[in-house]
């Protein structure tokens, strides 16, 4: 079984390309359902944010090319893009490198703004949507549980998000660089999601005079505005507010432009061409790019935030190195679990066989032991269990070590023959054998630090 990642991000593709491969929650679920229909994809999850679209998947060994082609077919179907338009922007990684990548993404190390916290919620949502679509089984439950724990641990144990901790923060920082000060400035926020809330928080902390929230759902606009004592309005009032504000920060999930050039043209005339700065952090973009053609209208996209991010990068380098160490440790732990999954049935069968022999031998001596007191019989039972466990301890450890070193198949077959366990399921290339219950048992034993709580439901 191969665990892999295929995708694009802000480092490999421009916003123009990324927005065409950005998917709504509904599309994510539909895409996952299509990906897992039939062969060769076993498990699949889709992470789609403003900075990346990735498909995480498992596929039988030997079918990796078929899996990639399967994914690209559906990416094209859902985006109406010819694969030739984006294939050069794709990255493809497998197994430990893929796990490390997912953990780094979740911790915010691969984000436009290193250490941003929004990605944790986005990964959690991708996990939930993909699970609801039927794309998540034992491997991905283990993967995302540990990825989310790792992300939280990185933020808890390092100061990586002490500076520009989000795209929203960077957008407000850009506005501050433009104006010098936000005192007496009026800002319009379009959208009422998490990024919009963070933007509002940062605007107020930088002394902005007023924040007006516009959202498709007026109730959500009101709820967000009420948190900060701001104003709210409906989309019908957008053109009216464009006549009065200095800064627009927009982050909706709309599949079309929310602000068009013609609107800005009319607004600039009405406001006698006083400067307006628009910061579009949505993917797909909310603002028609030709807005930049209007005098004194200055449009910035999410890709333009890179310069702002770079200014704080030096301060975060040391914390990023500390985060890398944490991630390396967590990846190593996950890989032990991942590689030992297939030996769980054999280990269980070996223990059951030994337990059957122990009970059978005790039964033979039942008459001789019946004169013992209950306490003495309990002591004999514990003694025989202890002997069995001690005999099995080293073989079980060796089986797991061989699995981690990718040497398990021959040794497992030999062990099965030696102990007459051939009827037990021995993993063959590309087969999945560990039950969810068995895998969970191994997961719990490999996470003895007490952090096996469910991040999915928290």
Swiss-Prot record:
One example of a Gene Ontology biological process annotation: protoporphyrinogen IX biosynthetic process from glutamate
Keyword ATP-binding in annotation: no
Active site: 50 (nucleophile)
Annotated residues for binding of NADP(+): 191-196
Tree of life domain: Bacteria
Pathway(s) this gene product operates in, as recorded in its UniProt entry: Porphyrin-containing compound metabolism; protoporphyrin-IX biosynthesis; 5-aminolevulinate from L-glutamyl-tRNA(Glu): step 1/2
Basic and acidic residues bias locations: 426-440, 448-458
One Pfam family linked to the record: Shikimate_DH
Annotated positions binding substrate: 49-52, 111, 116-118, 122
Enzyme Commission number, as recorded: 1.2.1.70
Keyword hit for tRNA processing: no
Span list, region Disordered: 426-458
Keywords noted in UniProt: NADP, Oxidoreductase, Porphyrin biosynthesis
Catalytic activity: (S)-4-amino-5-oxopentanoate + tRNA(Glu) + NADP(+) = L-glutamyl-tRNA(Glu) + NADPH + H(+)
Feature type site, description Important for activity: 101
GO molecular function: glutamyl-tRNA reductase activity; NADP binding
Quaternary data: Homodimer.
Family classification: Belongs to the glutamyl-tRNA reductase family.
Entry domain remark: Possesses an unusual extended V-shaped dimeric structure with each monomer consisting of three distinct domains arranged along a curved 'spinal' alpha-helix. The N-terminal catalytic domain specifically recognizes the glutamate moiety of the substrate. The second domain is the NADPH-binding domain, and the third C-terminal domain is responsible for dimerization.
The protein's role, per its UniProt record: Catalyzes the NADPH-dependent reduction of glutamyl-tRNA(Glu) to glutamate 1-semialdehyde (GSA).
Note: During catalysis, the active site Cys acts as a nucleophile attacking the alpha-carbonyl group of tRNA-bound glutamate with the formation of a thioester intermediate between enzyme and glutamate, and the concomitant release of tRNA(Glu). The thioester intermediate is finally reduced by direct hydride transfer from NADPH, to form the product GSA.
Protein name: Glutamyl-tRNA reductase
Organism annotation: Natranaerobius thermophilus (strain ATCC BAA-1301 / DSM 18059 / JW/NM-WN-LF)
Taxonomic lineage of the native organism: Bacteria, Bacillati, Bacillota, Clostridia, Natranaerobiales
């Amino acid at each position: 079984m191969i665990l892999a990642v295929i995708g694009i991000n802000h480092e490999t593709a421009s916003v123009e390309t990324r927005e065409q491969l950005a998917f709504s929650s509904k599309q994510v679920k539909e895409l996952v359902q299509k990906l897992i229909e039939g062969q060769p994809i076993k498990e699949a999850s889709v992470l789609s944010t403003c900075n990346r679209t990735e498909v995480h998947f498992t596929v039988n060994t030997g079918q990796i090319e078929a899996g990639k082609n399967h994914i690209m077919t559906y990416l094209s179907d859902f985006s109406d893009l010819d694969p030739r338009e984006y294939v050069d922007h794709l990255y493809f990684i497998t197994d430990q490198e893929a796990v490390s990548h997912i953990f780094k993404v979740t911790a915010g190390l691969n984000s436009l703004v290193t250490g941003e916290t929004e990605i944790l919620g986005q990964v959690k949502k991708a996990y939930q949507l993909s699970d609801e679509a039927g794309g998540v089984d034992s491997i991905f439950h283990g993967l995302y549980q540990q990825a989310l724990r790792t992300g939280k641990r990185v933020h808890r144990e390092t100061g990586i998000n002490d500076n520009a901790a989000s795209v929203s923060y960077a957008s407000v920082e850009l506005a501050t660089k433009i104006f010098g000060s936000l005192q007496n400035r009026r800002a319009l926020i379009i959208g009422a999601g998490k990024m919009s809330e963070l933007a509002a928080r940062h605007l107020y902390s930088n002394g902005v005079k007023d924040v007006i929230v516009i959202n498709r759902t007026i109730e959500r606009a009101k709820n967000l505005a009420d948190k900060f004592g701001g104003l709210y309005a409906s989309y019908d009032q957008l053109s009216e507010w464009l006549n009065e504000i200095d800064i627009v920060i927009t982050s909706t999930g709309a599949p079309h432009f929310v602000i068009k050039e013609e609107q800005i043209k009319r607004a600039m005339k009405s406001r006698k061409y006083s400067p307006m700065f628009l910061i579009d952090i949505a993917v797909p973009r909310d603002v028609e790019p030709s807005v930049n053609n209007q005098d004194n209208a200055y449009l910035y996209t999410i890709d333009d935030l890179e310069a702002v991010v770079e200014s704080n990068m030096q301060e975060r380098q040391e914390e990023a190195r500390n985060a890398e160490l944490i991630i390396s440790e967590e990846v190593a732990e996950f890989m032990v679990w991942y590689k030992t999954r297939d030996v769980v049935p054999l280990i269980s069968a070996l223990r059951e066989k030994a337990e059957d022999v122990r009970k059978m031998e005790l039964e033979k001596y039942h008459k001789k032991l019946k004169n013992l007191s209950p306490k003495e019989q309990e002591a004999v039972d514990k003694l025989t269990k202890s002997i069995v466990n001690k005999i099995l301890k080293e073989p079980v450890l060796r089986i797991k070590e061989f699995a981690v070193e990718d040497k398990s198949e021959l040794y497992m077959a030999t062990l099965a023959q030696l102990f007459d366990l051939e009827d037990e399921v021995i993993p063959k290339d590309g087969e999945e054998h560990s039950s969810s219950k068995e895998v969970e048992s191994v997961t719990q034993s490999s996470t003895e630090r007490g952090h096996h709580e469910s991040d999915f439901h928290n």
